[in-house]
Amino acid sequence: RFVVQVTGYGSRGERWIIDRYNITQSLRSDCDGESQRIDPASYPEDWDVLLTDVFHKSWPLASDPSQQMRLMAMAVDSGGEDGVTDNAYKFWRRCRRDGLGKRIYLFKGDSIRRAKLITRTFPDNTGRTGRRAQAAGDVPLWLLQTDALKDRVNNALW
């Protein structure tokens, strides 16, 4: 499944949760036309639901419901079970091909402690065998210092 949270930001740094929902059904269907359960690790095409059900969606403004708000950018967690990272990279490459590469960002928790909270990398495993994800240095991946970021969020709540 994909867990979606849409967050809006104000001009002074304030933020609001606009929507939160789970995507559990794929755009794929079985022989009876029934929607299949989503499986981001096994089916690269399942990632396309992030475009139809998140990126291209709009939400009414609280101050004027006749006005619609759309996403400026979308961050997607590329980590998880085997197959997820490779399919995330394939998804981002399709987005780049369609002109969305500068508005869709792949993230994952960093396994190395660094001073910077967020580090942009370009994974390249072309010379390494036994890797499921095909990374050729063409996909930007943002590594997050998850513990430090959680501490900041927690401190902001007080």
Model-derived regions: residue spans:
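A generic signature of intrinsically disordered, low-complexity regions enriched in glycine/proline
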Residues: E81, R114, R128-T129
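Polybasic, proline/glycine-rich intrinsically disordered low-complexity segments
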Residues: G127-A133, P140-L141
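C-terminal catalytic subdomain
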Residues: R120-T126, Q145-D147
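Extended repeat-based interaction scaffolds and adjacent low-complexity, acidic/S/T/P-biased segments
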Residues: D110-T121, R132, A136
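RNase H-like, metal-dependent nuclease domains and their acidic two-metal-ion catalytic environment used
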Residues: R1-S111, V139-W158
